[in-house]
């Protein structure tokens, strides 16, 4: 069994200025990862929702509530497990 993937770097969340219900999430891909779990929620310690993205370095998030602050974090995935969770990003 190999090593767990390296943590994700340069994780960014940018809410759309014209439609704040949408956000572009991007990151630098880990060379040893095949996918990523993006966690999000309305409090930094309550990231109860998860989106899994395979083979990409971005995700176009749609459906955020207007006037609500969201918090996001990401981890990389491979056959050996998951990386450490990134720092939480507020948006």
Where are these regions (language model features)?
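Exposed aromatic-hydrophobic patches
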Residues: 58-64
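Pro/Thr/Ser/Gly-rich low-complexity, intrinsically disordered linker/stalk tracts
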Residues: 1-32, 66-69, 78-91
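Extracellular low-complexity, O-glycosylation-prone stalks/linkers
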Residues: 26-58, 73, 82-88
């Amino acid at each position: 069994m190999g090593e767990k993937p390296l943590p994700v770097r340069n994780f960014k969340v940018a809410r759309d200025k014209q439609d704040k219900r949408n956000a572009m999430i991007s990151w630098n891909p880990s060379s040893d990862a095949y996918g990523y779990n993006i966690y999000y929620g309305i409090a930094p310690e309550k990231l109860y929702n998860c989106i899994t993205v395979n083979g990409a370095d971005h995700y176009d998030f749609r459906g955020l509530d207007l006037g609500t602050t969201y918090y996001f974090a990401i981890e990389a995935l491979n056959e050996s497990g998951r990386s450490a969770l990134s720092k939480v990003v507020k948006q």
